[in-house]
């Protein structure tokens, strides 16, 4: 996708948000400054604070979920919204400020030769590092998915990614909502559907608000869940998408 085709395609930024009143307005405003022509949908995933109100005031469209469904459930809403309205590209951006809007253009240009472009924290740009069980899980997932996708993937759990028309059609039909399903199982689905996946290096910023969920216990749980999510994803069979169209 060249710089001219970025503006010719209909792009929807989908931003899952749960109790992100401290950061969501700022992130929306930053995205709009970088890409003023794109549309932005904040999916309020059952927040009990002013996330929806502040996102709307900042200029985003807002879809409110009655209960918390997790990132997968929020993104499923976003993909169905995009498919119903004829968007060509969906870009997932976190509402906590960790994903730098200045990297969006590179993600979009990556769709020139791919159906899914993952923004990787571990591809040689920036100083982000994982440690402990979380690191081991990410390394193991990287090895498995690099073999499955036949390309090097260093950050398969990244939530910063761009997806083209074939990915939108696939994920609007079904998008996993289980923990880690939105990253691990969705990539297995994409590989089985013969979608092309690649990654680009990105810089990850500090959270603008809220509290990170890392601790030794949670990291150990993450390792176990990552392995289980991968096992379930490989066992399950999901509907494929017509792969006759170009990326």
Report residues per predicted region.
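A conserved acidic beta->alpha catalytic loop
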Residues: 44-52, 97
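Short beta-strand-to-loop acidic/aromatic patch adjacent to the donor-nucleotide binding site
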Residues: 87-98
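Short hydrophobic beta-strand elements that form part
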Residues: 12-16, 64
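Donor nucleotide-sugar binding loop of glycosyltransferases
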Residues: 20-23, 47, 100
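Catalytic donor-sugar/metal-binding loop of nucleotide-sugar-dependent glycosyltransferases
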Residues: 152, 177-178, 187-205
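Acceptor/aglycone-binding surface of glycosyltransferases and processive sugar-polymer synthases
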Residues: 65-84, 101-180, 206-224, 238-247
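Short, well-formed alpha-helical segments that are part of the catalytic scaffolds
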Residues: 19-33
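Cell-envelope/extracellular polymer assembly enzymes that use nucleotide-activated donors
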Residues: 10-12, 185
């Amino acid at each position: 996708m060249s710089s001219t085709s970025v503006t010719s395609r209909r792009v929807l930024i989908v931003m899952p948000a749960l109790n992100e009143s401290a950061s969501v307005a700022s992130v929306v405003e930053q995205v709009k400054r970088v890409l003023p022509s794109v549309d932005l949908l904040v999916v309020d995933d059952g927040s009990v604070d002013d996330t929806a109100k502040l996102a709307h005031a900042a200029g985003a469209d807002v879809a409110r979920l009655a209960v918390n469904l997790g990132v997968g459930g929020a993104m499923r809403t976003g993909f169905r919204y995009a498919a119903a309205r004829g968007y060509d590209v969906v870009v997932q951006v976190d509402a906590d400020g960790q994903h730098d809007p200045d990297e969006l253009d590179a993600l979009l240009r990556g769709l020139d030769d791919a159906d899914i472009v993952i923004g990787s924290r571990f591809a040689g740009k920036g100083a982000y590092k994982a440690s402990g069980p979380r690191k081991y899980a990410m390394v193991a997932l990287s090895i498995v998915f690099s073999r499955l996708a036949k390309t090097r993937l260093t950050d398969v759990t990244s939530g910063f990614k761009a997806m083209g028309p074939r990915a939108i059609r696939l994920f609007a039909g079904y998008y996993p909502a289980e923990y880690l399903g939105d990253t691990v199982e969705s990539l297995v689905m994409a590989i089985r559907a013969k979608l092309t996946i690649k990654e680009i290096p990105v810089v990850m910023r500090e959270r603008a608000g809220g509290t990170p969920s890392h601790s030794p216990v949670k990291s150990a749980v993450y390792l176990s869940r990552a392995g289980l999510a991968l096992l379930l994803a490989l066992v399950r069979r999901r509907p494929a998408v017509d792969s006759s169209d170009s990326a």
